[in-house]
Amino acid sequence: MVRQPEPDNLFSPLQRGVAAVRSPSVMRKPVSLLAALLLTTDFASGAIETPKNQPIEITSTGQTTYENGLATARDNVAIHIGDTDIYSDFAQYNSQKHEVFVEGHVRIYRDVNLYVGERAVYNIDTKQIRAEEMRSQYDPYFVSGTKISSISENAYLVQNGMFTTHDTPDPSFHLRAHTVRVYENNYVVFQNVTFYVGRVPIFWWPYVYQSLNDAFSFSISPAFLSSWGPSLLTQVAFPITDKIKGRLRLDYRTRRGPAIGFEANIDYGKDDSSWAKLKTYYIQDQNPLINRTSVPRGLVSTGRYRVSLEDKTNFTDDVYAIVDTTKLSDPFVMQDFYQGEFRIDPVPDSVVSVAKTDPFYTLTAIARFRVNEFFEQTERLPEVVLDIKRHALFGGPIFYEGETGIADLHRNFADGSGFENYSTIRLDTFHQLVYPNTYFGWLSVVPRVGFRETYYGETRDLGKTLFTPSDNPLVPDFLLPDPTAAKPIKDGGSTYRTVVNAGVEASFKMSREWEDAQSRFLGLDGLRHIIQPFTNFSWVSESGPDPKEILQFDRFEPSTQLRPIDFPQFTSIDSIDHWTVWRVGVRNRLQTRRDDLTVSWLDLETYVDVNFDNPYDRTPYSNLFNKLRFTPLPWAALVINSQLPALDKGFTEVNTNIVVQPVANVQLSIGHRYLNQNPFFNNSSLFVVGAYYRVNDNWGVGVQEQYEATIRTLEEQRYSVYRDLTSWVASLGAVIRDNGGVKEYGVLLTFTLKAFPKFGFDFNFDPGSSGN
């Protein structure tokens, strides 16, 4: 509801886009001035018409007159013309000047903007407003002044203006300017402007430009990080064109020096369906060898930079191209200045691809190349793949799927690593037939059979070289050391490899319901148990060269999880060996009703591999896997993903996460990651504990602890306090990190403007965690 403003020059709570609706009194007792005007000779042919042929409708509940070209109305006056609606206590329309004078509780709605004041003059031809002590809203901003006049159809000059985003008569902050020029949905220009917090002046500017475009934002971030020292990070985002939005970064770090960056987001193409993102950054680093980790570094130059480009171009509805590339000055620039991105992607990729999609196939051409010589990269220069999607052959019960590709592959090791690069041409084609069917109305059986043929232009000549395989059954025999200058790869010439695969999947479901299973404490309103046993038998025969002779590109990668045993889901083409594996398991699901919906109360999936012949796990049985998710109540959840060597030798992994919100203002979380005796990863027993307490409407506190028990190290501590400042949200926190014996300390202080979160002062003492 829009509250009536007080007559003094204060800000009033306003709503954006409120529809113009006649007051109840107008609807109860309408007296139409339009009807009276129709009886005069000047308007005998119809309604009042403006030069633009827009009729004016004036209604009120009081006296209405029309004399000498002046139409007057009193009490609950409502005027409607085009996209403009005007409400007041008194109104007078001059048919010669085409102006409406309104007085008393004036409200002018035009498009989605609202103007509120005591008196105003509105020109129906130019749509200009002249007023004193008027207030207006341009979401999320509020503007007022002692005098407002139009300087164009969508632009206004405000004298002695005030500007804020705080929706209250007494804003906690505002800008007061001698003059304010407002250009609707575009920008605002202030002259001789002072920034106030409450009634206290804080800062003065002779001139301020403020965009109303959602692409505009700014932040000033005093920052501290152990490796930076006291710093000032600033960034301004602004629209360059309607399709291009830019961001300029100007930073200074006392231990590092000045830095500059530019970023751009571009929308283009049909319906703006294509886009591009550019990121650039350069710093003249005064201390490039500063290292707050325990990992030693080599020589790093002082001129450090990153240039990144992401792009997706939609040429047609079924043809598109993707570009993703990053050029870095050194291997540590992302770790030092873009810690948020570094934690997600420490080794940026460089790929260009073009794809043609179809309901039956996808044709993709990929070029993957190395632009940073200090990183290892498997290049594809290029690779072209035709992927045939599973579909029925000639409309029958048998389905076909396959993929065929050719690739020029190069494995390039990091410069200075001591390893020797290698390459080959690979032609690979895979074809498979599938016969899904349901028997007895409940048993799903899906047999499959396929073959793969692969050509390699280069192989490894093992000769008389002996390699000692690992005695760990979880390490494949064909994993050989990477080539070095002392032990280079001997060319074994070209070769062909044939792979035949067959298998069958089967599953069925059973269910039972218990309507009398009722428990408010456990969140039960009836219970349904669904059990689904499943099995997957996979047989693969490989004939051709010894798998050790195959040069590795799409290769075996260490993982704690079971690998796919089906094609084409198994993508490590160069690590294919013969295997016979039977995967068997059961899914249990308990469902209940909640808010008239069926929800999962408990899910448990249990499975194990029987390894008749498995090159990736030479034990008779894999670990026993259990995936549990228990959600007894909307505010409580337990997730446990575990694998245990229950049937044979192996390793142990248990990941546990508990989240509860017992009352509305308290949330607790406990996580534990346990890993033991895996041959590829270090043992770990990591505890992560977090809590948040909302003290009241204005205060909140949070804490998070991360402890690695195997090395008895408290790796990270975070403590924070949150304060709601009505129109701002402030947070104060402390951070302590142990980077392998080298500790970092920081304090975090941020202010976020609730009405427009992109604007604010960011006192950010942990910039890495916020993505800077």
Regions found by a protein language model. Give the residues of each.
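Outer-membrane beta-barrel proteins and related beta-barrel translocases across Gram-negative bacteria
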Residues: 113-130, 136-157, 161-163, 168-179, ...
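Bacterial N-terminal signal peptides
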Residues: 30-42
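Serine residues within intrinsically disordered or low-complexity segments
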Residues: 12, 23-25, 32
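Charged (often Lys/Glu-rich) extended helix/loop segments that serve as interaction or gating elements
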Residues: 47-164
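Ala/Thr-enriched low-complexity intrinsically disordered regions
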Residues: 19-20, 40-44
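Intrinsic-disorder-associated, low-complexity terminal segments enriched in Asp/Asn/His/Tyr and depleted
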Residues: 8-9
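N-terminal start and proteolytic maturation junction detector
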Residues: 12-13, 41
